[in-house]
Amino acid sequence: MKKQIIFIIILLVIIAIDSKGQNQSSVLKKDGMEQKDFRTKAAVFHEKLNEQLKPQILDARSEEEFDQAHLPQAIQIDPAVEDYDRQLDRLIKSEPVFLYSIQTGRSTQVANLLAERGFETIYVLAPGISAWIGAGYPLEVSVQNKNRIVLDDFKTTLKSQEYVLVDFGSNYCPPCKKVIPVLDSLNSRSNHNIKTVLIEIDANPDIIKDFKITSIPTLILYKDGEPIWKKIGVPTVEEIVGASVKQ
């Protein structure tokens, strides 16, 4: 009997610790202040969104980004525009709000503001719109987007040279911008034979889906059409060249 009581006490302690850990995982600290973590994986975001007859979907990117591609039924809302507050006032506080941006910076900023205003349920797509596109979920894309590439043509490009480095990213993604000087430095060198290709995720959802890209920047080095190296984040020239030399 005594052993059973001890076992029950231990079990309750474990459950309490686990529960505490789960609660802590939903809280972020910024400048010493606690903020709720609204980040939601694409699958859950998609599932919760589909439960709504008239979902409140907010695109926290710029108007230019929104015009290139956006989630169906999404409303573009930019903190930089004059009628920003008026747009928020049109939302129903008791209904879930679904937010996304190129990553989670701008969408989290809006989410925190909504939370301060008393909105009850908020979801932020993480790690950004690339996760939605990579999962193959619906996306409305401008047919006039000059950065759009036909999937079959892209696959042909991968075999057009022995080494092809593909940079999956976006002009609006801060870390992606840091990749550009790396590629410029790579292209300025004459001691390698690596062709670079840039793929804008917003303009090429079919490519992003087919190659299962869910985070940006993502760089993949191909040799004769086959992937031999992958980097999520900002690489160095040495990493890229080193990956080709190892083959």
List each language-model region with its residue ranges.
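Short cysteine clusters
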Residues: 101, 173-176
